[in-house]
């Protein structure tokens, strides 16, 4: 039975194109009846994201570069002005400088480490803070993670420690926001051929290995991630918080 998001309002951050995990989630949210706010990174990304936002009939479409002062606040102000509330949020953004992603964590630069943490982890805490007053009746905050948070993944470099910090932040945010009825969870998909993943060296081999290693002997799709995300945004998951949930055909075991 499909999960019902009728009447719910959600923010989706991280759509880059039609291959994005965030797009698979947004499409599933919309199919379940949610009304969405959608963001794009910058003017270069806008032509790829705006047609998808139109397809979703998103009434709020705005730029959001978490490194730019004021842009995040402007998005949440627009949500407050139009809807007066927010029911769920999906954070699906991550970045590390190429040298730090491909090199050893031992050799990572101070600046690269700090920037990766700011964009990929601290931005989720900032969104949680801005979402809190809009979730007076409770809500669901979701962050995309990856197995590299807990296992060493070749060529994942600096993103491993950063995703570990993100998953830890999920637990702390869940503890802090739980009394307000706000649930916070991470979703950890298996390897997917997305734009973000294309920056990982030898990623094609990682995909092939994942399909062989996973007990179900296959890769997952953005639609698989969208289905789990819709469940986690819905009231059906009302007793679930502080968890990292895997949708990876069993790859993590």
What are these regions (language model features)?
Residues 30, 84, 135-136, 175-180, ...:
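A short hydrophobic alpha-helix cap/turn motif
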Residues 178, 183, 240-242:
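Short, small/polar-rich loop/turn modules that mediate ligand/substrate recognition or access, typified
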Residues 14-21, 94-129, 137-179, 191-193, ...:
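Catalytic loop of short-chain dehydrogenase/reductase
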């Amino acid at each position: 039975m499909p999960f019902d998001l009728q009447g719910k309002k959600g923010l989706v951050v991280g759509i880059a194109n039609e291959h994005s995990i965030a797009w698979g989630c947004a499409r599933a949210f919309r199919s379940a009846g949610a009304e969405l706010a959608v963001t794009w990174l910058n003017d270069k990304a806008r032509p790829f994201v705006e047609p998808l936002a139109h397809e979703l009939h998103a009434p709020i479409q705005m730029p959001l570069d978490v490194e730019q002062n004021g842009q995040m606040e402007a998005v949440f102000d627009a949500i407050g002005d139009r809807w007066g509330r927010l029911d769920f949020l999906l954070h699906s953004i991550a970045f590390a400088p190429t040298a730090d992603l491909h090199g050893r964590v031992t050799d990572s630069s101070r600046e690269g480490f700090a920037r990766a943490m700011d964009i990929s982890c601290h931005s989720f805490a900032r969104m949680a803070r801005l979402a809190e007053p809009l979730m007076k009746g409770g809500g669901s905050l979701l962050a995309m993670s990856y197995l590299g948070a807990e296992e060493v993944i070749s060529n994942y470099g600096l993103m491993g420690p950063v995703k570990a910090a993100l998953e830890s932040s999920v637990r702390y945010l869940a503890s802090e926001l739980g009394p307000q009825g706000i649930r916070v969870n991470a979703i950890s998909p298996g390897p997917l051929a997305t734009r973000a993943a294309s920056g990982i060296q030898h990623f094609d081999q990682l995909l092939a290995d994942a399909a062989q290693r996973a007990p179900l002997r296959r890769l997952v799709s953005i639609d698989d991630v969208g289905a789990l995300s819709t469940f986690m945004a819905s009231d059906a998951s009302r007793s679930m918080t502080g968890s990292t949930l895997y949708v990876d055909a069993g790859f993590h075991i």
